[in-house]
């Protein structure tokens, strides 16, 4: 018996943080991802491959990938995600990300990273990634491994504080990249082993948060309701 909503033909990443991040981003409108395959970003690669709504562009060289994403963003003025592995790979993004910052292009840079306890331990492909692009992005975010947040969440919509936190970061990153003066953001994701776990892909509803501009007109129906309430108010 197949669980309702499960697609037995498509394997999704077994990493819950990746699933939440990608589900929120696609629900908000992300439709194009430029990826540079590696080892540490395997959970992201599996997750992207499972989502048919995403246009995938695979470019092994990170510098070339970043400029390709920049070009797409310049033409479409829509958000484009960049995904790379850990280590020095993210610094190959820097020239294009700097250009995106000054051209006001909403690039969403997603970098895979080792868990923080492995940094500065002479482990291969590791460096201090959180904040590495701070001077050329609107904001940076760092998401700990799945096992880093296990406490229950006070919000009844979420099973754990981890799920709520990743949802919040995904929404905030997308909003920051696309609102006001658009620009790049950096989301660093820490992954521990194993990296290649999978689970059946399920389409699901996720919480999305959007900013309403201060000068946005109120819907006519709401204006009428407010007027009626004010007219009936006793002073």
Language-model region placement:
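N-terminal alpha/beta PP-like core and its mobile active-site loop of ThDP/TPP-dependent enzymes
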Residues: 3-235
């Amino acid at each position: 018996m197949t669980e309702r909503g499960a697609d037995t033909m498509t394997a999704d990443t077994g990493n819950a943080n990746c699933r939440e991040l990608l589900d929120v981003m696609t629900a908000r409108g992300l439709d194009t991802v430029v990826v540079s395959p590696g080892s540490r970003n395997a959970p992201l690669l599996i997750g992207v491959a499972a989502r048919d709504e995403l246009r995938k562009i695979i470019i092994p060289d990170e510098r070339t990938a970043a400029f390709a994403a920049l070009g797409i963003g310049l033409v479409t003025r829509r958000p484009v995600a960049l995904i790379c592995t850990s280590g020095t790979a993210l610094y190959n993004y820097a020239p294009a990300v700097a250009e995106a910052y000054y051209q006001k292009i909403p690039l969403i840079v997603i970098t895979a990273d080792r868990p923080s306890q492995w940094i500065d331990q002479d482990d291969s492909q590791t460096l201090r990634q959180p904040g590495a692009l701070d001077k050329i992005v609107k904001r940076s975010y760092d998401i700990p491994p799945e096992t880093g947040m296990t406490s229950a969440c006070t919000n009844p919509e979420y099973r754990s504080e981890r799920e709520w936190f990743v949802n919040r970061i995904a929404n905030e990153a997308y909003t920051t990249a696309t609102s006001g003066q658009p620009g790049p953001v950096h989301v660093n994701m820490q992954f521990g082993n194993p990296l290649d776990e999978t689970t059946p892909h399920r389409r699901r509803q996720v919480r999305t948060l959007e900013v309403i501009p201060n000068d946005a007109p109120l819907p006519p129906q709401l204006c009428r309701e407010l007027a009626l309430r004010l007219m009936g108010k006793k002073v």
